[in-house]
Amino acid sequence: MKKLFTIVSMTLIIPALTSCGGGPKGDMPWIVDRFDDIKVIRYEVPGFDALPLEEKELIYYLSEAAKCGRDILFDQNCPVNLPVRRTLETVYENYKGDRTTAEWKALEKYLKKVWFANGIHHHYSNDKFVPEFTEGYLLDAIETIPEEKFGSLNSLRGEVCRAIFDPALYPTKLNQKAGDDLLLTSSSNYYHNVSQAEAEAFYADMAAADAGNPEPVSYGLNSQLTKDDAGRICERVWKLGGMYSPAIERIVYLL
């Protein structure tokens, strides 16, 4: 029997859904959805309505800032996660065909799994999801939707399909098998076209250059290790003016 994982959705129960005594109504739909080994539930936050306005505003801005980091997490987990998610979301929002078929239900379930796991790999096993719908079905659904709905995603259609349906491509988000090159065999986007030996040597050289520092920093945090056009290893740092700058700018603004 599969282990049941639970998404706790922090839904604030508005006064209209509570009785005068402050308790939730018995018919409140606490279970929002369930698919595979996931159950989505909501719960009440006692006392939220009694908070001062300033504290409610603080919670709002913190939650908005967190949402701005969502696409960053998707991209960090695998380089194709965002194109896959956005393509499927466009289909989900615009498809006018029969939504009662088994293949549509399978596509919908796959998208929900991508939403929950922040990508195409299982949040616990790190294995890539196996679609229960066919590539032909997805392409047929895409063809029924005007191209302008997909925008720049049109040029990535082949890459998206390969990422979903080719079991040899991005098979695991995180490989920890002894003897394997853990970077080249993992699908996470923290390292791009860089081997484990190259990464270890890069950071060893960086640490050696800073050997006299009585308070050395940790290396390799908040960055992607990749190669420039000349093949030299370099870091793309997540910061204002660096990698993910538009999202980080918005986070800074909200905070």
Regions found by a protein language model. Give the residues of each.
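C-terminal motif of bacterial Sec signal peptides marking the signal peptidase cleavage site
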Residues: 15-19
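Bacterial signal peptide processing site
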Residues: 21-23
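N-terminal helix-rich structural modules
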Residues: 26-250
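Sec-dependent signal peptide recognition
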Residues: 2-10
